[in-house]
Amino acid sequence: MFELPELVTLAAQANETLVGRTVREGLLGNRPHKFVWYNRTTEEFGRLTAGRRVGQASTRGRWLFIPLEPGYVLLLGEFGGSLLFHPTDETLPEIYHLALRFEDGSALTARTAMWGAMELYEAGREQERELVRDMRPTPVDSSFTFKYFRGLIDEVLTGKKRSVKGLLTQDQLIPGLGNAIAQDIMFRARLHPRHDLAALDEEQRRALYEAIGATVRAAIDQGGRNDEVDLHGQPGGYARIMDRSAAGQPCPRCSTTIVKIQYLGGACYLCPACQT
């Protein structure tokens, strides 16, 4: 699944590559997929996108906003798979779930490997969409300060019991983060995924906050994770410290063997000595 660093990369590349191109034809999926969420029929999507120009893209959390001007915004979110630019539309993949063919002969395609939203809104209405409307600050927002982070933890603790992994990956409490990047955040913060959020002292809260910022910045600076591809089909440069290849290997910090556990619906890789 794309997380914040990959979407920041895709937005930047879209602005370098797509801005100003005029849509000749808009197409929805050529292969049915019950977990792709559309809000337009095939006919509506084609009619409303034809003749519109690509504007400046932006991202928030795990959502990508691509203006089709005048008047509309293409919203892609909560998905993994690929978003690819094709210099010629003769190179379109065999399967796609959305395509924009441009007047200059190039194209953009989106394909999801799991699930995702591919929706077209009248400009401004995309901000009313569920999961976008009430989105909290993300780690790249100026409002994501340590003061805000402390308040977020205190707010979360008034509800159900949470763990550190739960804070990072559940209910988009910190938009843009997912299970992949959370592994390295917890390693940098020296915290076990099951660590009770209520038990964090001030020093641990600070360490977790700083680990979020450091990990997200590192992944953005390197164009996203190396197990995801960018707009041009190239893998990102960020190699995770804690992923499936780390299991059974020595911890890079203390040499203890890295272990794998299943927790909160996904695999976790951790150092049983460093992360408590």
Indicate where each model-derived feature is located:
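Low-complexity, intrinsically disordered regions enriched in charged/polar residues
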Residues: 1-4, 39, 129, 143, ...
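Gly/Gly-Pro- and Ser/Thr-rich, intrinsically disordered tail segments characteristic of DNA damage-repair
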Residues: 1-121, 126
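Intrinsic-disorder/low-complexity coil detector
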Residues: 66, 86, 92, 138, ...
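Phosphate/anion-contacting hairpin/loop surfaces
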Residues: 73-176, 181-188
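Basic, nucleic-acid-binding surfaces and adjacent catalytic neighborhoods in DNA/RNA-processing proteins
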Residues: 22-44, 58, 152-276
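Generic detection of long, well-ordered alpha-helical segments
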Residues: 1-4, 90, 139, 143, ...
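A generic structural signal for well-ordered coil/turn residues at beta-strand boundaries
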Residues: 60-62, 94-96, 131, 247, ...
